[in-house]
Amino acid sequence: DGDAVLFSDEAEKIFQAHGLEAFAASEKAAAREPLSGGPFIGFLSALHQIQSLFPAEDSPIRTALITARSAPAHERVIRTLRAWNIRIDEALFLGGLDKGRFLKSFGADIYFDDQAGHCMSASEHVATGHVLHGVANEG
Protein backbone atom coordinates (compact mmCIF):
# COMPACT_ATOMS: atom_id res chain seq x y z
CA ASP A 1 0.00 0.00 0.00
CA GLY A 2 1.05 3.59 -0.39
CA ASP A 3 -0.28 6.03 2.21
CA ALA A 4 1.00 5.32 5.75
CA VAL A 5 3.10 2.39 4.46
CA LEU A 6 5.51 3.51 1.70
CA PHE A 7 4.53 7.15 2.10
CA SER A 8 3.68 9.25 5.13
CA ASP A 9 0.02 9.49 6.12
CA GLU A 10 -0.21 13.22 5.32
CA ALA A 11 -2.67 12.63 2.46
CA GLU A 12 -4.63 10.02 4.42
CA LYS A 13 -5.13 12.54 7.23
CA ILE A 14 -6.83 14.92 4.79
CA PHE A 15 -9.03 12.11 3.47
CA GLN A 16 -10.03 10.98 6.98
CA ALA A 17 -10.75 14.51 8.22
CA HIS A 18 -12.33 16.10 5.15
CA GLY A 19 -13.37 13.37 2.71
CA LEU A 20 -12.55 12.26 -0.81
CA GLU A 21 -13.20 15.58 -2.54
CA ALA A 22 -10.80 17.48 -0.25
CA PHE A 23 -8.23 14.69 -0.59
CA ALA A 24 -8.40 14.83 -4.40
CA ALA A 25 -8.11 18.63 -4.43
CA SER A 26 -5.17 18.56 -2.02
CA GLU A 27 -3.32 15.89 -4.00
CA LYS A 28 -3.90 17.72 -7.28
CA ALA A 29 -2.52 20.93 -5.76
CA ALA A 30 0.52 19.10 -4.35
CA ALA A 31 1.11 16.84 -7.38
CA ARG A 32 4.64 18.15 -7.95
CA GLU A 33 5.66 17.86 -4.28
CA PRO A 34 7.01 14.42 -3.35
CA LEU A 35 5.36 12.72 -0.42
CA SER A 36 7.44 12.07 2.68
CA GLY A 37 8.56 8.52 3.31
CA GLY A 38 6.55 6.17 5.49
CA PRO A 39 7.66 3.28 7.70
CA PHE A 40 8.38 0.92 4.77
CA ILE A 41 10.46 3.26 2.60
CA GLY A 42 13.65 1.56 3.81
CA PHE A 43 12.26 -1.86 2.94
CA LEU A 44 11.26 -0.72 -0.56
CA SER A 45 14.68 0.90 -1.04
CA ALA A 46 16.41 -2.36 -0.07
CA LEU A 47 14.24 -4.34 -2.51
CA HIS A 48 15.04 -1.80 -5.21
CA GLN A 49 18.78 -2.18 -4.56
CA ILE A 50 18.50 -5.95 -4.97
CA GLN A 51 16.44 -5.53 -8.14
CA SER A 52 19.02 -3.16 -9.60
CA LEU A 53 21.57 -6.00 -9.59
CA PHE A 54 19.56 -7.77 -12.31
CA PRO A 55 18.13 -6.83 -15.70
CA ALA A 56 14.45 -5.95 -15.18
CA GLU A 57 13.26 -9.07 -17.01
CA ASP A 58 15.48 -11.38 -14.89
CA SER A 59 14.95 -9.95 -11.40
CA PRO A 60 13.93 -12.54 -8.81
CA ILE A 61 11.88 -9.83 -7.07
CA ARG A 62 8.84 -8.06 -8.49
CA THR A 63 7.33 -5.13 -6.64
CA ALA A 64 3.87 -3.65 -6.97
CA LEU A 65 2.08 -0.72 -5.46
CA ILE A 66 -1.60 -1.54 -5.01
CA THR A 67 -3.44 1.48 -3.68
CA ALA A 68 -6.98 2.78 -3.28
CA ARG A 69 -5.90 6.05 -4.92
CA SER A 70 -7.10 6.99 -8.39
CA ALA A 71 -6.65 9.89 -10.80
CA PRO A 72 -5.70 12.64 -10.22
CA ALA A 73 -4.02 11.50 -6.97
CA HIS A 74 -1.84 9.02 -8.87
CA GLU A 75 0.40 11.77 -10.24
CA ARG A 76 1.91 12.62 -6.87
CA VAL A 77 2.69 8.96 -6.21
CA ILE A 78 4.44 8.53 -9.56
CA ARG A 79 6.41 11.74 -9.13
CA THR A 80 7.38 10.69 -5.59
CA LEU A 81 8.76 7.34 -6.73
CA ARG A 82 10.70 9.09 -9.51
CA ALA A 83 12.10 11.62 -7.02
CA TRP A 84 13.23 8.73 -4.82
CA ASN A 85 14.74 7.02 -7.90
CA ILE A 86 12.81 3.83 -7.11
CA ARG A 87 11.45 1.55 -9.80
CA ILE A 88 8.42 -0.59 -9.14
CA ASP A 89 7.22 -3.22 -11.58
CA GLU A 90 3.48 -2.58 -11.33
CA ALA A 91 1.27 0.18 -9.98
CA LEU A 92 -2.45 -0.38 -9.61
CA PHE A 93 -4.58 2.63 -8.70
CA LEU A 94 -7.86 0.97 -7.76
CA GLY A 95 -10.03 3.95 -6.91
CA GLY A 96 -11.39 2.22 -3.81
CA LEU A 97 -12.00 -1.22 -5.37
CA ASP A 98 -11.35 -4.31 -3.26
CA LYS A 99 -7.61 -5.05 -3.23
CA GLY A 100 -7.88 -8.80 -2.55
CA ARG A 101 -8.88 -9.85 -6.08
CA PHE A 102 -6.10 -7.80 -7.62
CA LEU A 103 -3.51 -9.26 -5.27
CA LYS A 104 -4.68 -12.74 -6.22
CA SER A 105 -4.45 -11.93 -9.95
CA PHE A 106 -1.01 -10.40 -9.52
CA GLY A 107 0.20 -13.49 -7.69
CA ALA A 108 1.62 -11.52 -4.78
CA ASP A 109 3.61 -13.36 -2.12
CA ILE A 110 3.15 -10.74 0.59
CA TYR A 111 1.21 -7.50 1.02
CA PHE A 112 1.39 -4.69 3.59
CA ASP A 113 -1.41 -2.23 4.40
CA ASP A 114 -2.22 0.17 7.23
CA GLN A 115 -5.97 -0.44 7.20
CA ALA A 116 -7.44 -3.50 8.91
CA GLY A 117 -10.27 -3.86 6.35
CA HIS A 118 -7.85 -3.97 3.44
CA CYS A 119 -5.73 -6.50 5.34
CA MET A 120 -8.74 -8.76 5.91
CA SER A 121 -9.58 -8.74 2.19
CA ALA A 122 -5.97 -9.29 1.16
CA SER A 123 -5.36 -12.07 3.69
CA GLU A 124 -7.86 -14.30 1.86
CA HIS A 125 -5.42 -14.44 -1.07
CA VAL A 126 -1.91 -13.58 0.16
CA ALA A 127 0.21 -13.37 3.31
CA THR A 128 -0.61 -9.94 4.71
CA GLY A 129 1.03 -7.64 7.23
CA HIS A 130 -0.94 -4.97 9.07
CA VAL A 131 1.25 -1.86 9.36
CA LEU A 132 0.24 -0.21 12.62
CA HIS A 133 1.09 3.30 11.51
CA GLY A 134 -0.82 6.42 10.62
CA VAL A 135 -4.16 8.03 11.24
CA ALA A 136 -6.14 4.88 10.36
CA ASN A 137 -4.61 3.17 13.41
CA GLU A 138 -5.09 5.94 15.96
CA GLY A 139 -7.55 5.57 18.78
Where do the model's predicted regions map?
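Asp-based, Mg2+/Mn2+-dependent phosphohydrolase catalytic module
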Residues: 2-29, 100, 104-105, 110, ...
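Alpha-helical substrate-recognition element adjacent to the catalytic core
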Residues: 3-93
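Active-site phosphate-binding/coordination module
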Residues: 85, 92-100, 112-114
